[in-house]
Amino acid sequence: MIVMSLTNEQIIEAIASKSVSEIVELISAMEEKFGVSAAAVAAAAPAAGAAAAEEKTEFDVVLKAAGANKVAVIKAVRGATGLGLKEAKDLVESAPANLKEGVSKEEAESLKKELEAAGAEVEIK
């Protein structure tokens, strides 16, 4: 029996020339031969890399301070959160306080602009 040694490049070229169904058969045969699952390796590899490169999609809007015009800030907080007058007043007076959590970047930016226009100091986390 003559054993020919193939380079990695030759193996890759041979696989590249196969159809999708042939590659699926090859993967199944390799899983059976070596007692492994390609799905487990494929799913675990991107998850590790994706976690580091993942962009933040949910933001918290934090009222840092009410500023000089507390009445305008209370009105803006009521409009943005739907709270009643007393709840909005209590929230503004307890600054720093979370106004909204888990909102989109666009909504957070819009809320920040609205509250800053009323005189509040706002932070997006």
UniProtKB/Swiss-Prot annotation:
The keyword Ribonucleoprotein appears for this protein: yes
Keyword terms of this UniProt record: Ribonucleoprotein, Ribosomal protein
Pfam families: Ribosomal_L12, Ribosomal_L12_N
Cellular component GO terms, alphabetical: cytosolic large ribosomal subunit
Gene Ontology terms: biological process: translation
A molecular function GO annotation: mRNA binding
Matches recorded under CDD domains: Ribosomal_L7_L12
Reported function: Forms part of the ribosomal stalk which helps the ribosome interact with GTP-bound translation factors. Is thus essential for accurate translation.
Subunit structure and binding partners: Homodimer. Part of the ribosomal stalk of the 50S ribosomal subunit. Forms a multimeric L10(L12)X complex, where L10 forms an elongated spine to which 2 to 4 L12 dimers bind in a sequential fashion. Binds GTP-bound translation factors.
Family from the record: Belongs to the bacterial ribosomal protein bL12 family.
PANTHER family (alphabetical): 39S RIBOSOMAL PROTEIN L12 (PTHR45987), LARGE RIBOSOMAL SUBUNIT PROTEIN BL12M (PTHR45987:SF4)
The name this protein goes by in its record: Large ribosomal subunit protein bL12
Lineage: Bacteria, Pseudomonadati, Pseudomonadota, Gammaproteobacteria, Pasteurellales
